[in-house]
Amino acid sequence: MKKIILSLLLLLPLSVAAHTNDEVKDTDNNLLKAALKGWHVRLGAGFNLGGTSPLPLPAEIRKIESYQPGLCFTVQGAAHKQFGEKKKWGLMLGLRFESKGMKTDATVKNYHMEAVNDDGSGTVRGAWTGKVKTEVNNNYLTIPVLATYNFNERWMVKAGPYFSYMVNGTFKGSAYDGYIRDQEPTGTKTEVQSASYDFSDDLRRFQWGVQAGGEFKAYKHLSVSLDLTWGLNGIFPSDFQSVTFALYPIYGTLGFHYLF
């Protein structure tokens, strides 16, 4: 009996290894079948650089004192299918996880805002003149739907809409070294040392926009891309009153892709 058990234990690793090899072969076969039907699978990662900005810049924002991009990254998988005999045109569908963030410091005048006074005296609301610090850090699941065009075997351009769901997000900051007028620019003036705001819970969950870019196939299994994504709806709902102008996420992405 002991010999039988010992034999089974010795055979178990071989069975697991064989099963693993079969799974790898099945995965390879599935990828090959997809490629034969015109679909080419890719995995990629990259870095986002940009910001969340009103367009055009409103008169209330007098000067951008500083801008600090966040450590923003993206990971994605996509499938690409080319059409026609010459394989010039194609369709690319993907799913990516991405972060978009920044920090800014600005000088503003008559900037409508609502914040909590750091001295404990309560909420201040009205037209703010002074300094404003803002921190934005949002994470999204994004589906791009892109048309592609190949100039040759190495160069490709792509463009189309994208649709995003915000997994979690932060929009917070502080107003300092200034004063606020009650409700409007001609209201009662109150000096404020520092006040904080946090509108993270008011961020819009669903966003959409356009993406356009180019890609260079450096090696058989490696390509490098540069893309621009431009949000077409603001990060806050249209009825949000604490920020009176729309803020759009505008980011450039440097990406690297492994082509199966």
Give, region by region, the residue ranges found by the protein language model.
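Transmembrane beta-barrel strands of outer-membrane/channel proteins
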Residues: 43-49, 93-99, 159-165, 226-230, ...
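Hydrophobic, lipid-facing positions within transmembrane beta-strands of outer-membrane proteins
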Residues: 39-41, 71-77, 139-145, 208-212, ...
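Extracellular/periplasm-exposed beta-strand and loop segments of Gram-negative cell-envelope proteins
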Residues: 51-70, 100-139, 166-207, 211, ...
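Short glycine/proline- and aromatic-enriched beta-strand/turn motifs that initiate or cap beta-hairpins
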Residues: 19-87, 231, 259
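A hydrophobic membrane-anchoring alpha-helix module
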Residues: 215-217, 221-233
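Outer-membrane beta-barrel "beta-signal"
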Residues: 216-220, 247-260
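Repeated loop/turn-to-beta-strand initiation elements of outer-membrane beta-barrel proteins
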Residues: 87-91, 154-157, 220-226
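Bacterial Sec-dependent N-terminal signal peptides
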Residues: 1-24, 39, 44, 147-149, ...
